[in-house]
Amino acid sequence: MQLNITGHNVEITEALREFVTTKFAKLEQYFERINQVYVVLKVEKVTHISDATLHVNGGEIHASAEGQDMYAAIDGLIDKLARQLTRHKDKLKQH
C-alpha cells in the first residue's frame, strides 16, 4: 500500500505521519488489496479535517471526517473507511 500524506495549513510532523501510517496499516485487515491511499489533512479556523481517497481493486473509496484536533479527525476517518471497506468487500463477494 502506497501512502501519500498532504497537509493544507498544517505541518506534517513525524509523529503525525507515524500515527497516520499506523492507523492506515490497520485498514488492511478489512480489505487486503488497497493499492494507493491519498490523505489530505487540513485546518480551517478551529476545525481539523482529514480526507482520504483509497484506490482498491474494484473501485475507489472516499471519506472525510472533522474533529477538535487532528488525531480525533483521523480516528473518525479510519472508522468511516473501515465501514466502507467492509461494505465494499461484502459487495465483491456477492458477485
UniProtKB/Swiss-Prot annotation:
It comes from the Bacteria. Keywords: Translation regulation. One of its GO terms (biological process) is negative regulation of translational elongation. GO terms for cellular component: cytosolic small ribosomal subunit. Gene3D superfamilies: Ribosome hibernation promotion factor-like (3.30.160.100). Induction: Induced during stationary growth phase. SUPFAM superfamilies: Ribosome binding protein Y (YfiA homologue). InterPro entries: HPF/YfiA_ribosome-assoc, RHF-like, RHF/RaiA. GO terms for molecular function: ribosomal small subunit binding. Associates exclusively with 100S ribosomes, which are dimers of 70S ribosomes. During stationary phase, promotes and stabilizes dimerization of 70S ribosomes by the ribosome modulation factor (RMF), leading to the formation of inactive 100S ribosomes. Belongs to the HPF/YfiA ribosome-associated protein family. Short HPF subfamily. This is Ribosome hibernation promoting factor. It comes from Salmonella typhimurium (strain LT2 / SGSC1412 / ATCC 700720). The gene is hpf.
